[in-house]
């Protein structure tokens, strides 16, 4: 456990908290918004038992990392990721992104290439684009982003409760695939995040990662749940597979947005199988 300094704001440094466990080829876990690295608990033990070195860090504004008032665009977040890889001198790394973390992974490749990477994993992907269009009617537009940001400013804690209901499909899975205690832990993590960071990251939903994906030339796995109410499988997972047709693509039946929790066994099985025998992926032009 430690901190990596990625910048400064006025008189204080911007430090990212990270944990580094195990040995072997590194697996870097990129959490979803508005959660932090603790959300990977269902995957951590499985990865370590399989013999991987696992690095999980809290992006700026979340978890135990610094909470600056700026720097929440994907270019900055991807640059932070690059500094983590460089500071720890990680090579042959596999980036495992969930939700917002997939945007960081894609933008990192777009900015820095794949020299340090062995593979990429996109779970419930924000890429290729979450912008509403004829091709993606379930996406968001400027008005949708503004609505979410207003809800966060009005009552962030009530908004978070509603968000987690849709993250985990609680009307279907509470008491079956997810406990009240797990929901409470996720709520506490989201509530503890910087309100500025929580609000600011929403703007990133309007980013287009199509050009970034063109630089993906390493082994790639795409995992998407068929019941994701946030990033629909038609609008996101299947479109990402169209952009990366040589990726290993797996749909998890009934998986909600945070299927790493509700369908942990299925996610872990596919993730570990991919890490054992990765399938090469090359983006389409």
Q: Which residue ranges define each predicted feature?
A:
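Catalytic active-site module of serine/aspartate enzymes centered on a nucleophile-bearing elbow/loop
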Residues: 245-285
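Conserved acidic catalytic loop of the alpha/beta-hydrolase fold
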Residues: 76-93
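Flexible "cap/lid" loop of the alpha/beta hydrolase fold
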Residues: 106-154
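Conserved alpha/beta-hydrolase "nucleophile elbow" surrounding the catalytic nucleophile
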Residues: 31-33, 93, 97-102
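Conserved alpha/beta-hydrolase catalytic His-Asp/Glu region
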Residues: 131-139, 151-214
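Conserved HGGG/HGGXW glycine-rich cap/lid loop of the alpha/beta-hydrolase fold
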Residues: 9-70, 84, 230
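Conserved loop-alpha-helix segment in the C-terminal half of the alpha/beta-hydrolase fold
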Residues: 215-255, 266
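Residue in the alpha/beta-hydrolase core beta-strand immediately N-terminal to the catalytic nucleophile
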Residues: 58, 94, 119-121
């Amino acid at each position: 456990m430690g901190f990596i300094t990625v910048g400064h704001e006025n008189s204080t440094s911007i430090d990212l908290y990270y944990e580094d466990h195990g040995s072997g080829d590194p697996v870097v876990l990129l959490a979803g918004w508005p959660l932090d690295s603790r959300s990977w608990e269902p995957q951590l033990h499985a990865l370590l038992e399989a013999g991987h070195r696992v690095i999980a860090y809290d992006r700026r504004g979340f978890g135990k990392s610094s909470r600056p008032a700026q720097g929440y665009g994907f270019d900055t977040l991807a640059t932070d990721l690059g500094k983590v890889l460089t500071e720890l001198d990680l090579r042959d790394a596999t980036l495992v992104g969930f939700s917002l973390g997939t945007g960081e992974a894609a933008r990192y490749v777009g900015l820095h290439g794949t020299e340090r990477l062995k593979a990429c994993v996109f779970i419930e992907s924000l890429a290729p684009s979450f912008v509403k269009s004829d091709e993606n009617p379930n996406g968001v537009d400027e008005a949708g982003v503004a609505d979410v940001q207003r809800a966060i400013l009005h009552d962030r804690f009530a908004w978070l409760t509603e968000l987690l209901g849709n993250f985990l499909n609680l009307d279907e899975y509470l008491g079956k695939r997810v406990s009240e205690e797990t929901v409470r832990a996720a709520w506490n993590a989201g509530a503890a995040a910087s309100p500025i960071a929580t609000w600011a990251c929403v703007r990133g939903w309007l980013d287009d990662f199509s050009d970034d994906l063109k630089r993906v030339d390493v082994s790639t796995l795409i995992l998407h749940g068929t019941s994701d109410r946030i990033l629909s499988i038609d609008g996101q997972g299947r479109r990402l597979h169209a952009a990366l047709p040589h990726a290993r693509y797996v749909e998890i039946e009934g998986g909600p947005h945070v299927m790493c929790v509700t369908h942990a066994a299925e996610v872990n099985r596919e993730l570990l199988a991919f890490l054992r025998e990765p399938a090469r992926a090359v983006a389409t032009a």
